[in-house]
Amino acid sequence: GCIPAQKDKPWPLSFAVQDPTVWGISITSWAAQKAGLTINGKVQSVRHTPANLVELAHVPSAPLAKLLDRMLKRSDNLIADSLSRALGHYYLKRAASYAAGADAVRGILKNKAGIDLGSALLADGSGLSAHNLITAKQMLEVLDYIALHDDELKLIGLLPVAGMSGTLGSRGSVQNPPLVKNVTAKTG
């Protein structure tokens, strides 16, 4: 993306948290201190919630359909990375990580679509890493599967449309006929 040279407000940026446990402990300690609370003991992460704890707050995630819509329309890499890690946790019952996410994607594509990613390297969920390596044939197999099974997957309707939505909404190269309103694509 582009950042304007003259900007009077801070530019909002989002980044994937590399270690959610360390971040969670750090942000909890910081927030308690800012609120004037004293913590007697150690802030720590637990794998299982002890029965005697009382939930003070709960923040539910947006529904998956909304997350996918935002991720695809706005090219939201933070959501892509987070969903990849969560997929690894949910599908494989392992700690959420990029490696677990990559293994889950491989397993799902193999079991559901018959697509073997073989030697492909999946380093993150967003595709930003230079270590992501996939052949054109493998990518085409995935895209063909999505196109042939979109009645079930419902992904194509979430993609940006030239001149209308998301990252293609104001992209100059697709603002004129015959492309405007006729190109549905994922940028990046």
Which residue stretches match the model-derived regions?
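Short, Gly/Ser/Thr-enriched beta-strand-loop segments that form substrate-interacting elements
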Residues: 54-60, 172-188
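A small/polar active-site loop signature that marks catalytic segments
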Residues: 1-153
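Extracytoplasmic
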Residues: 20-21, 150, 170, 176-179
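Short clusters of hydrophobic/aromatic residues that line enzyme substrate/ligand-binding pockets
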Residues: 122, 159, 183
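Short low-complexity stretches enriched in small and charged residues
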Residues: 39, 166-170
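Active/binding-pocket-proximal capping segment
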Residues: 149-166, 174
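A short linear-motif detector with a strong N-terminal bias
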Residues: 49-51, 100-101, 163, 176-180
